[in-house]
């Protein structure tokens, strides 16, 4: 037994920043961004916190599933841009929506929602819980260097959620990790110890090696999809729809070509 999706919900801030808007901040233009990244606009929070967005997505998922918050057995939140280190986003979502179940956070960046689904499937399959809320929220605008056109054009803010229940809706899954800190890094500065002797990084925003990110993303996306299809016994012509991570238009096209 794996799981089935009972309902989904999403939320994006109303404020939209276009490519033309970004051209007033950095040396770029709509044509450059559209051709290289495939993004024309992004939703950016003006007032919503990470938890605000997560709550709205969670409430919409619950409504779509037709269940109330007090029927949830577990909440798994995924984020790398939480409002606080503690309490976690999951704990604050639990409080805000009126749930009474355990809640915790996972931090796996772009792939966080997939890791959370797999984690939820484990809880459901061993019979520990019947209904699990998975919610992912990121307020990337708060950790972006808005003078770096290599990153500020890519990211936006928003949240997505799904309510999972017992069932056999999942045919197969495949996760992978390539550890390292040389491609994409988001340092944090919270060390106040007077005895800590290591140098503290002055970088506090997203630092990305675009070329290496592109190479890894194409490899990871295409290889993992092929491995997943093989484990599921599915051929390319059997697949009706692929919903990829949408950070970069060229990555998606190249991965599609390789598949």
Placement of each model-derived feature along the sequence:
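Conserved beta-ketoacyl condensing-enzyme motif
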Residues: 5-7, 48-108, 235-252
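Flexible, glycine-rich active-site loops centered on histidine and acidic residues
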Residues: 125-159
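Short, well-ordered amphipathic alpha-helical segments that serve as non-catalytic structural scaffolds
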Residues: 28-29, 50-65, 216-231
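Short acidic, glycine/serine/threonine-rich loops at helix termini
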Residues: 16-17, 86-88, 144-147
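Conserved catalytic cysteine-centered active-site region
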Residues: 34-36, 40-52, 79-132, 256-259
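Acidic, glycine-rich active-site loops and adjacent beta-strand->loop/helix elements
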Residues: 10-11, 78-83, 108-113, 136-141, ...
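A contiguous, well-structured pocket-lining segment that forms one wall/lid of small-molecule binding clefts
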Residues: 200-259
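Condensing-enzyme catalytic core mediating Claisen C-C bond formation in acyl metabolism
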Residues: 1-47, 148-215, 219, 223
């Amino acid at each position: 037994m794996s799981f089935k999706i009972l309902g989904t919900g999403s939320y994006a801030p109303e404020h939209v920043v276009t490519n033309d808007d970004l051209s007033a901040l950095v040396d770029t233009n709509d044509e450059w961004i559209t051709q290289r990244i495939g993004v024309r606009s992004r939703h950016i929070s003006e007032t919503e916190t990470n938890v605000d967005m997560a709550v709205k997505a969670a409430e919409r998922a619950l409504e779509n599933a037709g269940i109330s918050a007090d029927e949830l057995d577990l909440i798994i939140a995924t984020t790398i841009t939480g409002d606080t280190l503690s309490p976690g986003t999951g704990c604050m979502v639990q409080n805000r929506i009126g749930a009474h179940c355990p809640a915790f956070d996972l931090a796996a960046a772009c792939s966080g929602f997939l890791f959370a689904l797999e984690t939820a499937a484990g809880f459901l399959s061993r019979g520990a819980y019947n209904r699990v809320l998975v919610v992912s929220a990121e307020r990337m605008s708060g950790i972006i260097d808005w003078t770096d056109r290599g990153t500020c054009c890519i990211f936006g803010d928003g949240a997505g959620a799904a309510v999972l229940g017992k069932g056999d809706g999942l045919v197969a899954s495949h996760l992978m990790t390539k550890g390292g800190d040389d491609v994409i890094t988001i340092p944090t500065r919270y060390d106040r110890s007077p005895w800590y002797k290591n140098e503290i990084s002055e970088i506090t925003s997203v630092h990305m090696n675009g070329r290496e990110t592109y190479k890894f993303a194409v490899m990871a996306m295409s290889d993992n999809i092929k491995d997943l299809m093989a484990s599921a016994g599915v051929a390319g012509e059997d697949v009706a729809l692929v919903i990829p991570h949408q950070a970069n238009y060229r990555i998606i096209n190249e991965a599609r070509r390789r598949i």
